[in-house]
Amino acid sequence: MISHEHPISIYWNDCSKSEQKKLLTRPINNKLNDIYINVKNILTKVYNEGDRALFKFNFDFDNVQTTQLQIPTEIIMNSGRNLSNEIKQAIHTAMTNITRFHQAQCYSEIIVETLPGVYCQQIIRPLNIVGLYVPGGTAPLLSTVMMLGVPARIAKCKRVILCSPPPIPDVIIYTAQLCGIDEIYQIGGSQSIAAMGFGTESIPKVDKIFGPGNIWVTEAKRQINLAPNGAAIDMLAGPSEILIIADNTANPIFIAADLLSQSEHGPDSHAILITPYSCIAEKTKKELHKQLKILPRNDIVRNVLLNSRMIITNNLMECFSISNSYAPEHLIIQIENASDYLHYITNAGSIFLGNWSPETAGDYASGPNHVLPTYGRAVATSGLGVIDFQKRMSVQQLTQNGLLQLSSTITTLTQIEQLKAHEYAITHRINYIKEQNEHSLLG
């Protein structure tokens, strides 16, 4: 049972360096080795047995007897029949905002003449076949369909498939259809990642796999990414996390609501409040317990709060420094004139400024993607975007004059690196040009 002392308020500057480091350390799953072995066995079975293994896993894991994996076109076309206008309008509004934001991300192709006669281009091409994974659970995660399907459509991927555990709710199928996805397969978990990574009789092998999932799905993505005949992946997502920076103008009701909203994602979620004001921490703590009573999933949230932190600092600058070290998936800055402090933030998956920007808005409908780096990976990686569904290719074209101008530079560098064949690739051409010029003069 969680006491009213939790989460415990901790004064940052009263802690040693090792204690400070421990405060920002994410929970570690002690069952990783067992999961690794079990996932490896699932992947091997799918690789060897294809669809037959998938049908068996559907029965074993989801207690569903399937005779076909692909959702028929007729079901896709009729998926919105039993959905209310209110639901359809909410999906439409969210998709409009997500589309608007992601369309603005599109990169322009470039061409640069680095020297006279040396033309360099960068061109963009969509990925050919991509696989989207949408987790199952107690409620349909249609927001994930939009966050994956919209950028895939904008990127103009040639073929997009979607996998989700059976039975797939109509609202998931309907949302996928709106995203232009007409290949939907009823298979979930590690086995769906294996199917997309290796390919089976029914499910095509994809170039890249996208989407969040539990620790089994994440481990499957990791193994598929490392397999020589596997597929690329978007990222390895860990448990969800939120960090809130608050000053004395912040509303404890809002802070508590945001901490709780993130905590209900699962028992491994991480929630941290950092503030220079102990009174804000205490008021938030009281509000947490008040709001906790009305939540239907409060057992999960209670466990998360046991491992949550309320860190008291000397000033706001210290808050920013701690946040950058932690590199949260979601960062909420509930301080006065929050946008004035944005330049102090260097590491975060997604940032929410001010009292009126709850993390929930980003989860569903404001526009940016909610597939974000976790476990501190925001120090080097970004949230999902259109570019993740595309690839950049460089193009170079040199004229004779361009090669002549660049040849001495190239040959000098090849000689330093002692790569003689590289040097000859230049000198043979230069000699040919000189011979042609001599013949022209003689002719």
Curated annotation (Swiss-Prot):
Database matches in Gene3D superfamilies: 1.20.5.1300, Nitrogenase molybdenum iron protein domain
KW Zinc (keyword) present: yes
Pathway terms, separated by semicolons: Amino-acid biosynthesis; L-histidine biosynthesis; L-histidine from 5-phospho-alpha-D-ribose 1-diphosphate: step 9/9
Example GO molecular function: histidinol dehydrogenase activity
Amino acids binding Zn(2+): Q262, H265, D363, H422
CDD domains: Histidinol_dh
Binding site for substrate: S240, Q262, H265, H330, D363, E417, H422
Reaction it catalyzes: L-histidinol + 2 NAD(+) + H2O = L-histidine + 2 NADH + 3 H(+)
Cofactor or coenzyme needed: Zn(2+)
Pfam families (alphabetical): Histidinol_dh
Family assignment from sequence similarity: Belongs to the histidinol dehydrogenase family.
Subunit: Homodimer.
Stated name of the protein: Histidinol dehydrogenase
Organism per entry: Blochmanniella pennsylvanica (strain BPEN)
